Amino acid sequence: MADGEVENKLRDVIERKILDARRVFFSEPVTDKSAADAIKKLWYLELTNPGQPIVFVINSPGGSVDAGFAVWDQIKMMTSPVTTVVTGLAASMGSVLSLCAAPGRRFATPHSRIMIHQPSIGGPITGQATDLDIHAREILKTKKRIVDVYLEATGQSREVIEKAIDRDTWMTADEAKDFGLLDGILFSFNDL
């Protein structure tokens, strides 16, 4: 058996063990592909044993808002209670994903970091003034959606949230807990 085949078999065994434990790991940027992969795993667990808890482990620098909200919406539609655990980093859309669990089910490991900020448009912006105006209105709608998520999750005022996301705001796990982004610090998966 070639090294590549052995590596693929090992990866499959590991993936199966993780899914059998009802864990889904999201350890990459939020893209259409990574979101689709996560959604497939989440729904596999939902359909094979509905209503049983799932742990969604996040280590992501963020990425696509639309792809992230696709994962968010799917989790909200499931009957299985989902617990989020940040390990490492939940930045930008990764931080939003960490909030898709119900209150009391949002955790981070002790050395994790959370970063929140307002959405941005990447790359060079070109087009007619009317098109640019459309893009500006769309990003403001996206900002409002994200602010609303942080408002609901944290209980902070709109003014506090808008100030916090005006620029990149980095938090330790303890700071994120104090801010209301987390319900607790997780020292062992046995504590879930």
Swiss-Prot record:
Its main location: cytoplasm. InterPro entries: ClpP, ClpP/crotonase-like_dom_sf, ClpP/TepA, ClpP_His_AS. It catalyses: Hydrolysis of proteins to small peptides in the presence of ATP and magnesium. alpha-casein is the usual test substrate. In the absence of ATP, only oligopeptides shorter than five residues are hydrolyzed (such as succinyl-Leu-Tyr-|-NHMec, and Leu-Tyr-Leu-|-Tyr-Trp, in which cleavage of the -Tyr-|-Leu- and -Tyr-|-Trp bonds also occurs). Its EC number is 3.4.21.92. It is found in: Cytoplasm. Gene3D superfamilies: 2-enoyl-CoA Hydratase, Chain A, domain 1. Belongs to the peptidase S14 family. HAMAP family: ClpP (MF_00444). Cleaves peptides in various proteins in a process that requires ATP hydrolysis. Has a chymotrypsin-like activity. Plays a major role in the degradation of misfolded proteins. Fourteen ClpP subunits assemble into 2 heptameric rings which stack back to back to give a disk-like structure with a central cavity, resembling the structure of eukaryotic proteasomes. This is ATP-dependent Clp protease proteolytic subunit 1. The lineage of its organism: Bacteria, Pseudomonadati, Chlamydiota, Chlamydiia, Chlamydiales.
